[in-house]
């Protein structure tokens, strides 16, 4: 299962959870988080999630789409979605999460964050 924005993007990396900037507070369905945690232990995903065991490596969830850009050589990683997958990783005590990186421009980041983007984009 892939998102409409990153279906052809195979730029998947593992990032430390601490590297992700999550500017939007999540609204979580803990039943969904718990189901994802069970999937992470190797249990077959429920039919309602739209995934089959063939879609995933055992114990893995789909990667989280992450917008990234570099400023002064330092990469910044923004996760605007994937809140249930990220919480499942938190709850399971996993320090790393698979992410599908999507390069973005400063203007794209401003579309997502508005004036709040300035804290990341303004000069050092």
From Swiss-Prot:
Quaternary data: Interacts with tpx1 in response to oxidative stress.
Enzyme nomenclature, EC number: 1.8.98.2
Protein's UniProt keywords contain Cytoplasm: yes
Gene Ontology cellular component terms for the protein in this record: cytoplasm; cytosol; nucleus
EC class: oxidoreductase
Gene: srx1
Role, per record: Contributes to oxidative stress resistance by reducing cysteine-sulfinic acid formed under exposure to oxidants in a peroxiredoxin. May catalyze the reduction in a multi-step process by acting both as a specific phosphotransferase and a thioltransferase.
Pfam families the UniProt entry points to: ParBc (PF02195)
Gene Ontology MF terms in the entry: ATP binding; sulfiredoxin activity
Species for this entry: Schizosaccharomyces pombe (strain 972 / ATCC 24843) (Fission yeast)
Protein name per Swiss-Prot or TrEMBL: Sulfiredoxin
Family (UniProt): Belongs to the sulfiredoxin family.
